[in-house]
Amino acid sequence: MDNQQDNHIKLLNPLTLAYMGDAVLDQYVRTYIVLKLKSKPNKLHQMSKKYVSAKSQAQTLEYLMEQEWFTDEEMDILKRGRNAKSHTKAKNTDVQTYRKSSAIEAVIGFLYLEKREERLEALLNKIITIVNER
């Protein structure tokens, strides 16, 4: 990826990064559930909520921040994602939780669009592990 495109991705609206990150996380979790957990179809959605709900994402973010898991660059994206003003109302959660969830999704979206596959894979695997240990 060239420098100009690199900078373009960093400058994207953090909620745009979160939008992309939400899709990436959802696909990763669905793949994990289908291939690893081999659950019945009617249970798949219920199981995926355990990983992708705003509450779960917020708890995971808090844990990862306590562990100082994120790079400085990722912390900048997290802060932008958390502080971004959304014009939609959070469903089934409070604003703080929604913002934390958007923050971790923004980092996922950033890593995906930057094509940082190893770091993205490490983060997605870490999310699965953390949720499984709860």
Swiss-Prot record:
Ribosomal protein among keywords: no
Cofactors demanded by this protein: Mg(2+)
Predominant cellular place of this UniProt entry's protein: cytoplasm
Keyword field: Cytoplasm, Endonuclease, Hydrolase, Magnesium, Nuclease, Ribosome biogenesis, RNA-binding, rRNA processing, rRNA-binding
Catalytic residue positions: D22
The EC number(s) this enzyme carries: 3.1.26.-
Top-rank taxon, per record: Bacteria
Cellular compartment(s): Cytoplasm
GO molecular function ontology, one term from the record: ribonuclease III activity
Xref: InterPro entries: Mini3_fam, RNase_III_dom, RNase_III_sf
Any one cellular-component term (Gene Ontology): cytoplasm
Keyword field contains Repeat: no
GO biological process assignments: rRNA processing
Reported function: Involved in correct processing of both the 5' and 3' ends of 23S rRNA precursor. Processes 30S rRNA precursor transcript even in absence of ribonuclease 3 (Rnc); Rnc processes 30S rRNA into smaller rRNA precursors.
Subunit composition and interactions: Homodimer.
Family per similarity comment: Belongs to the MrnC RNase family.
Protein name, entry field: Mini-ribonuclease 3
Protein's organism: Staphylococcus aureus (strain NCTC 8325 / PS 47)
Gene: mrnC
